[in-house]
Amino acid sequence: MRSRSSSLEDTGKAGLSSPRGGTRRDQANHSSRRPQEATPTIHRNHRQREHKPKPKSRDLTRDDLLFLLSMLEGELQARDEVITVLKAEKIDLALLEAKYGFVTPTAVLKSLQRDGLQQSSGWQEDIYEKPIAELDRLVEKQRETHRRMLEQLLLVERAHKHTLHRLEDEKKNHRDFMKKSDDFTSLLEHDRERLKQLIDQEKTYQERKEEESNKQVTNLKDELTKLKSFALLVVDEQQRLTEQLSQQITKVQELQNSAGQAQEELNSAQTRLQDEENKVLRLEEELRKQTCHFHQEQDAMTAKLTNEDAQNRQLRQKLSSLSRQLDELEEINKTLHRAEEELQELRDKISRGECGNSSLVSEVEELRKRVLEMEGKDEELIKMEDMCRELNRKLEKEAKQSCSLKAEVDKLNHRIMELEKLEDAFRKSKQECNSLKSNLEKERTMTKHMSNELDVLRVRIKELETTEVHLEKTELTLKEDLTKLKTLTVMLVDERKAMAEKLKMMEDKVQNSTGKLQAEQDKVNTVTEKLIEESKKTLRSKAELEEKMCVATRERDELKAKLKTEEEKSSDLQSKVSMMKKRLQSLETVERELLRNKSKEEHTKSPGPYRYQQEDNKVKDLTQEVERLRRKLKEMKVVEGDLLKTEDEFESLEKRYSNEQERAKALMEELETSRKELSKYQLAEKEESNQEQILYKRLKEEEAKSSHLTREVEALKEKIHEYMGTEESICRLKTDHTTLQRKLTQQEVRNKELAREMETLTRELERYRRFSKSLRPGMNGRRFSDLHVSTKEVQTDPTDSLSPNYKNLAPLERALVNGKLYVESDPEDEANYNEIHLTKCSPSLMNSVNNLNNNMRRVRGPFLKPRENHHAVNNKRQNGNHVQQGDVVLTHSPGQPVHIKVTPDHGHNTATLEITSPTSENAPSYTSTAVIPTTGAPPKQRITILQNSISPSGKPKGSPPPPESPCTPDRSLSPLTMTAYSQTLTSESCGPLTPDRALSPIQIVSVTTGSPDRSEPAELLGGQTVLRVSPERQNSWQIQRSNSTGPNVITTDDNKIHIHLGSPYIQAVTPSAKPIGPYYSLGPEPRVPVLNNGTPAKGNNKITSSIVIKPTSGPISRPSQITVSNLCD
């Protein structure tokens, strides 16, 4: 395992090549981590030098030398850049805040500081001007608070005197009150005698009243008999009238029913009439239309018939003329036939010659002429025949037409018959309509008559209703009269009963009043006795209070004197503090000048980051001083707040006292008013002692006054209770005085703490001087503080040659537990004075403790008072190492080996650390997981070791432990947070030691007890290991604080385990490391491959480092030995 200085040199000179031996060794360390033997570092380095082959002498040309020079210049420039970067990273935030005034963009401020370092510009401002100004303000504020305290004490003294005067006044008032109470008892006795006389008078009055009431009862009985007879007559009349009313109501109802039925019939008849009228009107319109149509058709037909008749007549006339002509022609034809026959006969005769003569020939000739004429007439006859034929044809046509006309006429006759039938029906309907109209008129007349009758009935009903109303009114009046009579009778009976009851009640009241008077007399006697006893008690309490107030005044004077002495002490301490500050400032100036001169001389030799470690140490001390001053400021503010609270409480007490005085005044006024009322009552009694009504009034007034007296007695009791409340308020004042005294004692304790802080400051000054002396170079270039440590190997034996600066760190370690300052105070004031947190941080001890406090639980570690009990052994040095109270010391039985296995898993970039004790069966085993860095940067690791298979603790994390037994099993139930400090001091085998190696930051190994099931985020400080130990296993292990000059140390009894993980100068980037991957459990001494810059070699993936602690026998008081194996598989 490499030491811290070598790892720091690796981080500062990674990737640089120089002809120096240190850089070559660093390159060799980066390229391959060789297994180192368990021998001291100096011997190993000498062995390496012996085995190094000497480089062959080679003549180089000028060009080669120039090339080498250019390469070296480039490497030097790169080294300077790395140095500036590391300086900027390691610069304290407090310095940045002091220079730039703000801290928030840290990266920007660091880059500005880095540029300033490259330009070699130093600090221009003084950082500690503001704290000095704040100290001056604090001194002025303390003076003001002192003045205010004195003013408040004067006000309290005045108030005390005022309360004493008030108590004397109260005594006088109480005496007066006792005298008045005696007068009041005498008045009550007189009232008792007067009430007895009143009771006798009341008895005589009641006897007279009984006689008068008996007379009134007899008179009322006679009146009752008369009223009963009158009431019977009234009831008979009422029954008769009700019967008449019922008969009239039935008649009215019958008439109303008949009228309703007639109205319904009328309504139905009216509906029927309306329907029939509508039908008749419709039929009349149809008949009118049909008659008009028939008349028109009849006129047309008659016109046609007349025309046809005329034509028929003409034709008949023609026929008759033609028939006549035919007859004439037939007769002529007959005559002609006869003439022809005669002619033929004649011809025959002529031919025959029978007869011949001239006359006949003339006759024949005449006959021939006639025949010719007749032939001419035959043509006419033919024409006439033709004409007759045409006429026959026309006649046939006319006959046909006449037949058709006859048919039409028949049809018309049928229709006329139908129309006549319709006319008959119409006539009948008209007759029916006329009859219906007549019926309607009759019904209308009937309805008018009925409506008139209805109106008459309504008028009669109204009259009946009015009569009903009058009857009801008369009935109501009669009922009212009856009820009045009944009520009168009942009232008379009730009055008689009431009079009897009143007589009994008056007797009972007289008896009750006598009993009440006796009870009130007893109460008054008891109240007077109680008042006398309470007055005696108040006098005693007042005397006791006066004594207590005298004692309180004495105590107050003593407290004032103590305050003055404490203030003088605080002023002396402040003056000493100012002197120490001035001395510190002068020393700082001297140290700055020395450091500037040394930095100019060693700028070419030593690397850059170590220059600023001296400034870091100075900043450490100054930040501690600033934090102490801030704590003092906070304490003064708390004292001011307490004083303000006491002022408010005193004002509230004054208000209460004034309220109680006002109440007492009000009670006295009420007593005076009651006395005035009693005097008025006595005067009124003397004036109106003979009147009866006044006796009733007096009885009521006496009852009211008795209640008033009871109220006054209650008010007196309340006043006594209020006096008791004043006593309680005085007790509270006493408690306030005790709290003030307690606070004064706390102030004294704080002054003692200031004195102790002064001692610590003086020790720090001495340590600072020793540091400055140790920083001066020695004879061979080394520093005096580094001469006793020269190995890179893990130291297993205890060393008593501790550096003087860490011997002086014990008070600091007592004052700082887990990054917080704890003040021991009384348990009552723990809420006000519990913890004061540190605010500023630096890369020094305060910075590391504060960063550790962010991830650890709070623990209140008492450190001011030394514990003189059976646990004081834990404060002694064990093996030269100081064990602090508040740290858990884990003991382990000697003679048993402890195996520590480290099994990395490069698939997940984690490593598992396992601590076991294989021999004991019930020994606890612890496992942990850390992240392995894969880049070339230096490792940043924090290992959280958890105990395997333990039950979680019962208490919560934040519960504070008892302060009496910090290292005993009594504290196993509460989780604890423990810190151990150790300084990392490294040596270099070749080359002069740099001044920064003795001033490396303090490494912290923390052991936290608590429930392991909650995995808290782990923040890495450089080279920090966190062990979690369950509360059940605290009795078997012991972790001691190591103040040796080696790296981080966890000790088991007399054995030491020094575990170094990474560079202390580089802060953590990854805040948490979660256990990922399986745990590999290998043998006790497995071989592991070599790591190149934090990455595994190309062999097997499993790398295991184990530390086995085995007991050895020898004359040295070191019973265990550490075997470190780091071998390849």
Swiss-Prot record:
Superkingdom of origin: Eukaryota
Region (Disordered), start-end ranges: 1-59, 563-582, 894-975, 1110-1129
InterPro entries, alphabetized: Cortactin-Actin_Reg, Cortactin-binding_p2_N
Assigned GO CC terms: actin cytoskeleton
Basic residues composition-biased segments: 43-55
Parts forming coiled coils: 188-776
Record's keyword terms, sorted: Coiled coil
Polar residues composition bias: residue spans: 909-932, 1114-1129
Example of a GO biological process term: protein localization to actin cytoskeleton
Family: Belongs to the FILIP1 family.
Record protein name field: Filamin A-interacting protein 1-like
Annotated source species: Danio rerio (Zebrafish)
Gene name of the encoded protein: filip1l
